[in-house]
């Protein structure tokens, strides 16, 4: 039909395996033979993309495909709900190898690849490694292994892939799922343990904050934290006094329209200006702001979104934090109150 109506069987994506076998029908034997002569002149050993355009493979040859006739992926027990895709393996297989994550110009995806230029540090590389492990094409127990950890390690969980990948592959969520299995078999490093438990450890830092803020950028401190695996190219954050924030909070407008401002661990301890400006903006729109733990709500420590736990696969602890937040809403009767978070 395409030939009858003088159409083209290929376009911007080229010919490849799918269309090459139809060249003789479309172009005729004379032109097809000319293609072969050009190929043989410049590529005598047939090294450059063999089986495409010239002397093509059959498009339905399963031996050429990632999914062979005997392909079967393992349906493992997961901590996240992957039913939207079928299961975890099906979600991984959403990566169709289009390579959009290899771009170096616009957008954000994929930050680790933009630095290393290595396929293994790419969304596609990680997805393929996970897929090969769960379809038993890698050595036994490869899914929960140190090699898989190395593959996933440089993913910064920015979720750019979920936004910019044509298939919306969510590698940040997949990494979190992987780590939830990995840390049941292997112990966490001190560095990862400190960051993941920051919501519970921050009170220790606050006790020594006057001293910490003065010495944190000294060379001797940089040498110490480097040994634990932290990057020293950036300055360590300053632990901030919450007094200015509490002053603005107490002096804000009173209104029937109330909103909960979720003061996460990092904003309330290291970047209180974000919360201060947020209160002012919300007040301008006629909202009175409620910050959990700043009122008489009997919280032993500030509420936490569980983000650090999620990033390190500590999903049981993340669930604990989310349950604390739900309980806070229920106890105080804030069922219909809007919740604002700061990214």
Sequence positions of predicted segments:
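Ferredoxin-type iron-sulfur electron-transfer modules and their immediate structural context
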Residues: 8, 16-154, 172-173, 177-187, ...
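Catalytic or ion-translocation cores adjacent to nucleophile or general acid/base/metal-coordination motifs
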Residues: 2-5
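Iron-sulfur-cluster electron-transfer modules
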Residues: 139-343
């Amino acid at each position: 039909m395409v030939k009858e109506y003088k159409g083209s069987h290929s376009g911007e994506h080229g010919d490849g395996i799918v269309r090459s076998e139809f060249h003789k029908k479309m172009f005729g034997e004379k032109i097809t033979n000319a293609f072969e002569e050009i190929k043989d002149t410049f590529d005598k050993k047939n090294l450059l993309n063999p089986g495409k355009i010239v002397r093509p493979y059959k498009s339905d040859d399963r031996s050429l495909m990632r999914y062979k006739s005997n392909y079967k992926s393992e349906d493992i027990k997961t901590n996240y709900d992957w039913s939207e895709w079928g299961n975890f393996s099906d979600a991984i297989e959403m990566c169709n190898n289009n390579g959009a994550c290899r771009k170096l110009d616009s957008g954000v995806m994929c930050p680790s690849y933009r630095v290393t230029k290595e396929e293994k540090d790419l969304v596609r590389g990680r997805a393929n490694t996970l897929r090969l492990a769960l379809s038993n094409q890698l050595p036994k127990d490869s899914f929960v292994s140190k090699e898989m950890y190395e593959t996933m390690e440089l993913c910064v969980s920015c979720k750019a892939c979920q936004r910019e990948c044509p298939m919306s592959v969510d590698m940040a969520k997949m990494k979190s799922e992987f780590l939830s299995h990995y840390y049941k078999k292997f112990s966490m490093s001190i560095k990862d343990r400190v960051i993941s438990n920051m919501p519970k450890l921050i009170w220790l830092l606050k006790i020594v904050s006057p001293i910490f803020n003065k010495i944190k950028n000294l060379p001797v401190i940089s040498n110490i934290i480097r040994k634990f695996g932290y990057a020293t190219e950036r300055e360590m954050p300053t632990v901030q006094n919450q007094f200015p924030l509490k002053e603005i909070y107490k002096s804000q407008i009173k209104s029937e329209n109330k909103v909960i401002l979720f003061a996460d661990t990092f904003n309330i301890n290291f970047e209180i200006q974000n919360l201060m400006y947020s209160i002012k903006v919300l007040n301008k729109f006629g909202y009175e702001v409620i910050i959990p733990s700043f009122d008489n709500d009997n919280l032993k420590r500030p509420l936490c979104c569980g983000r650090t736990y999620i990033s390190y696969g500590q999903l049981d602890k993340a669930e604990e934090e989310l349950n604390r937040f739900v309980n806070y809403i229920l106890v105080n009767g804030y069922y219909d109150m809007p919740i604002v978070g700061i990214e």
